[in-house]
Regions:
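A short glycine-rich, Lys/Arg-flanked "PGG" loop and its adjoining helix->strand segment in the class I
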Residues: 144-159
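A short beta-strand submotif of the Rossmann-like class I SAM-dependent methyltransferase core
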Residues: 133-136
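Class I SAM-dependent methyltransferase SAM/SAH-binding core
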Residues: 66-122, 145
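Conserved catalytic/acceptor-binding region of the Class I
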Residues: 138, 162-257
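Short N-terminal helix/helix-N-cap motif within the alpha/beta-hydrolase-1
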Residues: 140-142
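Class I SAM-dependent methyltransferase Rossmann-like catalytic core
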Residues: 2-64
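A short acidic, Gly/Pro-enriched loop at the edge of an enzyme's catalytic core
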Residues: 121-131
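C-terminal lobe and adjacent flexible extensions of AdoMet/dcAdoMet transferase-like proteins
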Residues: 218-322
Length: 322
C-alpha cells in the first residue's frame, strides 16, 4: 500500500512488519488470499455486500466519466480483477504494499499501484465511486485516519465497503466460544491463539471491532448496513441449494491454518511463552485438520455512503501538508 502509485517500490521482505503476514510475493500468502476471497464470495453469494447500493452507484453512465473503483489492500488483486470483469465499463485500481504484476488474465480496465495506506491517499485524487477495504485492519496504525482518507477520495454518494474477520471462533450454533484456560473442558487451542492475537492488536491500538462507530462519528458517512458471513472451518457443514459450504469450509481451513501459523512469531515477540505458543500451534493444526471442535469464523461486511460534507484536514493533517 506508498503515496506514489506510479513508482514500483523497492522489494519488500518476505514478511511485512506491520501486516504480520507474508507479503504477496510469497506463493503461500497469495494462495491464502485467493482462498479467502473465494470462500467469502461463496458465503456472501456476491463479490460485495450492500449489493443494491453498489450496483446503483456503478451503473453505466451516458454522460461524463464512467465509475471508478478503488481496492485498498488489494492483496493478490483477485477482487479488483473480478470487479473489473463484473463492471467492464468501470475503471478499477487495486493498491497494496507490494505491486501486483498484471498479466494476460488482467482485464484492460483494471490497474494496480503501490500504496502504503498508513501514509494517506493524497496521490489518488477524489473521484472514486466505490472504495473497498477488506482484511487490512491489523496493518492500519490509525483507523480514524483510514476512514478520513477514504472520505477524501470518495465522491459524495459513493459507497465505502469495509470487511474484516473477527479474532474469535463460533460453534455450530453460531455462539461465540467462551474463553477457557488450557486443561479445562472446552478449551480450544485455535481460539486461544486468536484470543492472544486480539489482545496484542488491541494493545497496539488497532481495534477494528467497532468500525461502525468510527464511520458514524466521522461526519463523512451514513452507515447503511452490515452483513455477517459465518464460514465453517473445515468441510463439516452440509451444502445447501444456495451455498457450497463444504468448499467454503475447506478453503477457510487452509486460510485460517496459514493465518494462525504465520502469527506465532508475533505472539512470541510480544512476550508470550515460546514453548506454550509452539504447543498451541501444534494442537491448532490438528483441530483444523480434524474439524474438532466444529467451528465457524465470522467475517463482518459493512457499507456506508459518503455524505455531502466537504472534506477538511485535521490539525495533524494540516501540519503534515507541504
Amino acid at each position: 500500500m506508498a503515496s506514489n502509485t506510479n513508482e514500483k517500490p523497492q522489494p519488500n521482505p518476505t514478511y511485512n512488519a506491520i501486516y504480520h503476514l507474508p507479503t504477496i510475493e510469497s506463493i503461500t500468502e497469495r494462495g491464502r488470499l485467493d482462498f479467502q476471497h473465494t470462500a467469502l464470495r461463496i458465503a456472501l453469494g456476491s463479490l460485495y455486500a450492500g449489493h443494491d447500493f453498489v450496483e446503483a452507484r456503478l451503473a453505466p453512465r451516458t454522460e461524463g466519466p464512467q465509475p471508478r473503483i478503488l481496492d485498498v489492500g488489494t492483496g493478490s488483486g483477485i477482487w479488483a480483477e473480478s470487479m473489473a470483469r463484473e463492471f467492464p465499463h468501470a475503471q478499477v485500481l487495486g493498491v497494496d504494499l507490494t505491486l501486483v504484476a498484471a498479466d494476460s488474465n488482467t482485464p484492460p480496465n483494471c490497474q494496480f499501484g503501490y500504496l502504503d495506506a498508513n501514509d494517506g491517499f493524497t496521490s489518488l485524487g477524489d473521484s472514486f465511486d466505490v472504495v473497498h477495504v477488506r482484511s487490512v485492519g491489523a496493518g492500519i496504525r490509525d483507523q480514524i485516519r483510514l476512514v478520513r482518507d477514504v472520505a477524501r477520495v470518495l465522491k459524495p454518494g459513493g459507497v465505502f465497503l469495509w470487511g474484516g474477520g473477527e479474532l474469535n471462533l463460533y460453534n455450530e450454533n453460531y455462539e461465540r466460544l467462551p474463553r477457557v484456560e488450557e486443561g479445562q473442558e472446552g478449551w480450544c487451542a485455535t481460539n486461544a491463539i486468536l484470543t492472544q492475537l486480539r489482545e496484542v492488536t488491541l494493545k497496539q491500538g488497532r481495534n477494528t471491532h467497532d468500525f461502525k462507530t468510527l464511520l458514524e462519528d466521522s461526519g463523512y458517512f451514513t452507515y447503511r448496513g452490515q452483513e455477517d458471513a459465518f464460514c465453517p472451518i473445515g468441510a463439516w457443514k452440509e451444502d445447501t441449494p444456495k451455498t457450497a459450504w463444504k468448499q467454503v469450509g475447506e478453503l477457510f481451513a487452509l486460510n485460517l491454518g496459514n493465518l494462525v501459523q504465520s502469527h506465532g512469531s508475533l505472539l512470541i515477540q510480544s512476550g508470550r511463552d515460546k514453548e506454550t505458543i509452539g504447543r498451541w500451534l501444534a494442537v491448532t493444526k490438528e483441530e483444523i485438520e480434524t474439524c474438532n471442535p466444529k467451528t465457524h469464523a465470522l467475517f463482518r461486511h459493512l457499507w456506508a455512503v459518503r455524505t455531502e460534507a466537504e472534506w477538511t484536514p485535521s490539525a495533524a493533517e494540516a501540519a503534515e501538508a507541504p
